[in-house]
Amino acid sequence: MVATVFAFVICFSSFIKVKKATVAAYQITSISTERNATGQQQQWTWALTNPNPGNGDNGTLQDVSHWSLALSPLAEASLVSAEYSFDQITWVSVSIQMDRDPTIKTCTTDDVLKFDVGTRGGESTYYRVTFDREFTTNTFATSYIKTGGGRNGCNLYYFAGVGGTTND
């Protein structure tokens, strides 16, 4: 019996092609979580990076067109500002309107904070949000990444983001 199984494996192993596993995923890195100088606000900063830019073929990733964050109702109510930057020096303010994003309607019906700017090649884009209260880190905070051209659809990404409050 063992000889039969061995012969079968040897015979058909020539038909099996082993493909090296590759994982292409955008990287969301927590840069900082800090209180401002007066201690009245907490600021969160993340970097979103495309580690393998391309057209979406052969393990490459298309540029991100926008990044949408889901926030708890308390975080939504405490949101003071949202900004993005390509260099962490010049920051551009964005609307803090929480709303449904029609471009990811097949992924979620939740209201999200939409940063309508994404990545450019392999360079990081930085995102910053400010709250008027302090929050803990949720290592499984939810976000949605939409790619340019929509080829890879909308992608659910978990990241180290805004969690529960620390001062209730």
Q: What does each of the following model-derived ranges do?
A:
Residues M1-A21:
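Sec-dependent, cleavable N-terminal signal peptides
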Residues I16-D168:
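Extracellular or exported targeting regions of proteins
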